[in-house]
Amino acid sequence: MNCQHKMELFACRASKDFAAKVVAELNKLQPEGEGEIHLGDSEVTVFSDGEFQPSFTESVRGATVFVLQSTFPPAENLMELLLTIDAAKRASAYKVIAVMPYFGWARQDRKDKPRVSIGAKLVANLLCAAGVDRIMTCDLHADQIQGFFDIPVDHIYASKVFIPYLKSLNLENMAIAAPDMGGAKRA
């Protein structure tokens, strides 16, 4: 890989299995002589009151750190991502990129009735406050969520892979549904 900063890939607990598959696929694409990509070592200390503290067991100083974590429920998955981003920044990572296959609270993208929060905007604020430099996510509930960030957001659409795959199955009477009007355009 020709870049100034080494790349390190880490996974939070909810995404360890998925991250191992990502690393295997990345290594298939890696040009000869570039060296193998590995999943970085990290650990999570759980305290007696249930609080947890992620930490890196190897140096990330000067590295571009990718942290892979889906933020599906429970909320601890989001909190672990936030703490891991913070730990990377405090360990002098050059940049921290959050890879979020599932962006939790994305369905709360607007104020659709009085006295409700806009959860997606709050999550964006929390990620930025933790120190993330870039977000990579897949199939956001609504495109406008990208505008909640003041950092780059790479919004990846699974349809580029999913639609050709579904067509290859030659299924009859196939129906695709969406949970609400926000997802109807994608369906």
Residue ranges and their predicted role:
Residues 1-187:
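PRPP-associated nucleotide enzymes
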